[in-house]
């Protein structure tokens, strides 16, 4: 039985585990993997908006809009959204130079 399924009980005023194979390398590896999984899961739940926004938008950034008036930004967004090929309804990629 691994440490992951054992129940810790008070033994002689100390907390211990009733298992003889706690030094088994497989048990140690399973415990490390379990702890890492728990840490990663907690971080994912805490920062999922930041993480997935970074993957979704951060890796493929568009042209810089710094110094461009808001009206021109809105016009560019509308052009990007309406850039559809009428023949087969596939999106057309517009690259500005």
From Swiss-Prot:
Top-rank lineage group of the source organism: Viruses
Recorded topology in the membrane: Single-pass type III membrane protein
Secretion signal, residue range per the UniProt entry: none
GO biological process: protein complex oligomerization; symbiont genome entry into host cell via pore formation in plasma membrane; symbiont-mediated suppression of host autophagy
Compartment(s): Virion membrane; Host apical cell membrane
Key words of the record: Disulfide bond, Glycoprotein, Host cell membrane, Host membrane, Host-virus interaction, Hydrogen ion transport, Inhibition of host autophagy by virus, Ion channel, Ion transport, Lipoprotein, Membrane, Palmitate, Phosphoprotein, Signal-anchor, Transmembrane, Transmembrane helix, Transport, Viral ion channel, Virion
Cited function: Forms a proton-selective ion channel that is necessary for the efficient release of the viral genome during virus entry. After attaching to the cell surface, the virion enters the cell by endocytosis. Acidification of the endosome triggers M2 ion channel activity.
Other known facts: When the channel is activated, one or more imidazole moieties of His-37 probably become bi-protonated.
Subunit details: Homotetramer; composed of two disulfide-linked dimers held together by non-covalent interactions. May interact with matrix protein 1.
Domain notes: Cytoplasmic tail plays an important role in virion assembly and morphogenesis.
Record-given protein name: Matrix protein 2
Gene name for this UniProt entry: M
């Amino acid at each position: 039985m691994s440490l992951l399924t054992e129940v810790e009980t008070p033994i002689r005023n100390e907390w211990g585990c009733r298992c003889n194979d706690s030094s088994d390398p497989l048990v140690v590896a399973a415990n490390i993997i379990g702890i890492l999984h728990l840490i990663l899961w907690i971080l994912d739940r805490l920062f999922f908006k930041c993480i997935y926004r970074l993957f979704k938008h951060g890796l493929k950034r568009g042209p810089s809009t710094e110094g461009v008036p808001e009206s021109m930004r809105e016009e560019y967004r509308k052009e990007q959204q309406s850039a559809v090929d009428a023949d087969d309804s596939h999106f057309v990629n517009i690259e500005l130079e």
